[in-house]
Amino acid sequence: MKVGVYGASGRIGKLLLEELKGGYKGLELSSVFVRQKCETDFSSFSHAPLVTNDLKAFVKACECVVDFSLPKGVDHLLDVLLECPKILVSGTTGLEKETLEKMQKLALKAPLLHAHNMSIGIMMLNQLAFLTSLKLKDADIEIVETHHNLKKDAPSGTALSLYETCTKARGYDEKNALITHREGLRSKESIGIATLRGGDVAGKHTIGFYLEGEYIELSHTATNRSIFAKGALEVALWLKDKAAKKYEISEMFG
């Protein structure tokens, strides 16, 4: 399957190019979208991709777009994909409501998966968080996330997805249960997210379930960003030949 990388100059984008260098499990890098000159030398790649700043040409040259870009970039990408539908794997966080609505429209035309985190470990953490939230009904839930000092969105998309998992399990009001800045006493049906930024931390997420006299913490730490690139490519392989729909990463492993 021919893959196009959107957001190739970013941290994960560069790792995607490296993974696709020799062809990842039969995936071929066919196109790379760049707004400025690309730093990557493609002479050693098994196939020379189209490197372009023409978004339509980029999309037409591939069968699947793997996106790790910025929110505005995803919005522009979706405009083109709605005209020329292709499989979409997106790991970009902080998307606006209008962009998510465009994604839903694309799902009527092509298979896609949008996830805040593509790692297997986070998928398992979500499942454990749901089960623990359901079983420990009296536990207070708090989430702590830590990332590098250049991360733009806060809280992280992964922390918000974990929050959504816990609210669904508990039946909390998703819009009103979130606390990112706390003053005074803790309200019962609330879940706090604490955000830490520093150094070059790839990502750490911890969910605490606090009871009287004891507590449980579930934690995931990313020690190498390559897990996100490899995870995204595994998703691309899984989506091949799937029907048009917006899939959840839990379906892939469930």
Curated annotation (Swiss-Prot):
Keywords tagged on the record: Amino-acid biosynthesis, Cytoplasm, Diaminopimelate biosynthesis, Lysine biosynthesis, NAD, NADP, Oxidoreductase
Annotated InterPro entries: DapB_C (IPR022663), DapB_N (IPR000846), DapB_N_CS (IPR022664), DHDPR_bac (IPR023940), NAD(P)-bd_dom_sf (IPR036291)
GO molecular function: 4-hydroxy-tetrahydrodipicolinate reductase; NAD binding; NADP binding; oxidoreductase activity, acting on CH or CH2 groups, NAD or NADP as acceptor
Locations listed in the record: Cytoplasm
EC identifiers of the protein: 1.17.1.8
Family that this chain belongs to: Belongs to the DapB family.
NCBIfam families listed in its UniProt record: dapB
HAMAP family: DapB
Protein name as it appears in the record: 4-hydroxy-tetrahydrodipicolinate reductase
Classification lineage: Bacteria, Pseudomonadati, Campylobacterota, Epsilonproteobacteria, Campylobacterales
